[in-house]
C-alpha cells in the first residue's frame, strides 16, 4: 500500500454544474479535491463537517445568512450539524479549488 494520493491520475466527477470533484477514500476518511466555477451556488444546505484549504481562487460560504469570504491560502473548519449548515457561493466568472478532509459518517 502506498501513501501517495495521486489526484492527477483520477478522473473528475461532476455532481452539479459548476462543481467538479476527485475523491480518495480510505476507511472512514476521505480527501476531496473540489473545484467550483462560474456562478455556482449549492442548491441545498450542507450539514456535513469539513476541514479544508483553499488552493486557488476566491469564493464565499453562506452560513445560514452570514456570508464569509475565502481566498487562496485560507484554511476552513466547519463542524457538522444544523447550526453549521452552509452553502458555497461563487460570483459570475469566479473559480476556486479546495482540498477538503472529511470523516465519512456511518
Place the predicted regions along the sequence by residue.
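Conserved short histidine dyad/triad with adjacent acidic residue
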Residues: 30-46, 80-81
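Short acidic-glycine-tyrosine-enriched beta hairpin
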Residues: 65-81
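Ligand-binding loop in jelly-roll beta-barrel domains
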Residues: 80-106
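Short strand-coil-strand connectors
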Residues: 27, 62-66
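Short loop/turn positions at the edges of beta-strands in beta-sheet-rich folds
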Residues: 25-28, 55, 80-82, 92
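Short, conserved beta-strand element in jelly-roll/cupin
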Residues: 36, 45-61
